[in-house]
Regions:
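Conserved strand-to-helix beginnings and helix N-cap segments that scaffold or border functional pockets
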Residues: 111-115, 210-217
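Glycine-rich, histidine-containing beta strand-loop boundary motifs that form or position
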Residues: 48, 103, 132-133, 233-235
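The catalytic "switch" region of P-loop NTPases
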Residues: 1-28, 49, 64, 189-198, ...
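P-loop NTPase nucleotide-binding core
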Residues: 58, 63-189
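Walker A/P-loop-proximal flanking segment of P-loop NTPase domains
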Residues: 1-89, 115
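Short hydrophobic/aromatic beta-strand immediately N-terminal to the Walker A/P-loop
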Residues: 43-47, 101, 200
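Walker B catalytic acidic pair
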Residues: 203-204
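Switch/connector loops and helix/strand junctions flanking conserved nucleotide-binding motifs
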Residues: 54, 109-113, 239-245
C-alpha cells in the first residue's frame, strides 16, 4: 500500500479500483461481505491512521454502490467501473443501498451537525433528483428540513442546548421527539423506489472540533436508530479517543466510550 495525494474524484477512484494502487481491493471485497450480512440498523468504524486512504476507501464503496443500484441515476457502466476484477463481484448483489457521504470536518463550523446531515441526505446525489418544491416528494423533504431547522433555529422552538440546561425540559423532550420523527420521515422520502437501506458515510470525524464530533456521535446514535439505516464512520479511532478524553478529562476511557457508537470495527491495513 502507498499513499495517494490526489483528490478522490470519480476518475481517480475508478483508476485505483483498476490498478489497486492502494492495495485496498481485498478490503473492499471483505467490506461487501460485511454489508451483505447486516440485518437491520447497524454502525461500524472503518479505522486507520491519518493519510492511509480511509476517505478513498469509503468513497470507492459509495461509488460502487451507486453504480450497482439500477434505480439511481448514477447507475451505468458497471463493467467500466469494476473492469475485470472478479474480487469485487460481490458488490453486484448489493443493489439496494443508497449511499450518502458526509464530511464532518467540512461542516464543523455549525453549532449542531443534524441540519447539515439532514441536508446531505436530502440533497446529495440521486437522493435529491426529485427535490423540487412543486412535487410531493419535494414538499415532504422541505417540510422535514423545516421541522429539523425549527428545533435548532432562533425563536419559535427552544434549542436543545437551552432546553437541556433546565430551561424547559418538557419542550426538550418534545423537540427530541420531533427530531426523531423528522429523521424517520426523511428516510421515508429518500428510500422509496430507490433503495431499501440508507448507507450514511461519516468521514473525517476525528479532525473536527471536539464538541462537534461528540454531537455527531450522540445525535446519530439517538436519532438514526432505524432498521433501514447503516452508519459507517471513517475514523482514526485512536485520535478520536484522545478527542473524547480531552473533552471529559484525564483518566476518562475514550476507547470504552466510543464503543457505545459502533457494532463493529474494521481496521484497514
Amino acid at each position: 500500500m502507498r499513499r495517494i495525494d490526489s483528490a478522490p474524484t470519480r476518475d481517480t477512484l475508478v483508476k485505483l479500483l483498476h490498478n489497486d494502487a492502494l492495495g485496498r481491493n481485498g478490503d473492499l471485497a471483505e467490506f461487501a461481505g460485511i454489508l451483505k450480512s447486516i440485518e437491520g440498523g447497524f454502525s461500524l468504524f472503518v479505522d486507520a491512521d491519518w493519510g492511509s486512504g480511509k476517505t478513498f476507501f469509503v468513497r470507492q464503496v459509495a461509488c460502487i454502490l451507486e453504480e450497482v443500484n439500477p434505480f439511481l441515476e448514477s447507475h451505468g457502466d458497471l463493467d467500466g467501473l469494476l473492469g475485470n476484477n472478479c474480487e469485487l463481484a460481490p458488490y453486484t448483489e448489493l443493489n439496494s443501498f443508497l449511499p450518502v457521504y458526509y464530511n464532518a470536518w467540512e461542516n464543523d463550523h455549525w453549532d449542531d451537525p443534524l441540519p447539515s446531515i439532514a441536508a446531505s441526505i436530502a440533497l446529495q446525489g440521486d437522493a435529491c433528483a426529485s427535490f423540487r418544491s412543486d412535487t410531493e416528494a419535494g414538499e415532504k423533504i422541505a417540510g422535514t428540513l423545516d421541522a429539523i431547522l425549527g428545533v435548532f433555529g432562533h425563536g419559535g422552538a427552544s434549542s436543545l442546548r437551552d432546553a437541556f440546561s433546565g430551561r424547559d425540559l418538557i419542550q426538550a423532550y418534545r423537540d427530541r421527539e420531533t427530531l426523531r420523527s423528522s429523521v424517520s420521515n426523511l428516510v421515508d422520502v429518500a428510500l422509496p423506489e430507490k433503495a431499501n437501506t440508507l448507507l450514511l458515510i461519516v468521514d473525517e470525524l476525528d479532525r473536527c472540533r471536539p464538541s462537534f464530533a461528540m454531537k455527531v456521535l450522540e445525535q446519530l446514535k439517538n436519532l438514526f436508530a432505524d432498521d433501514r439505516v447503516v452508519i459507517v464512520y471513517s475514523v482514526n479511532a485512536n485520535q478520536l479517543s484522545h478527542v473524547v478524553e480531552g473533552t471529559y478529562g484525564q483518566g476518562f476511557d475514550g476507547r470504552r466510550y466510543l464503543s457505545r457508537f459502533y457494532d463493529l470495527t474494521i481496521p484497514l491495513r
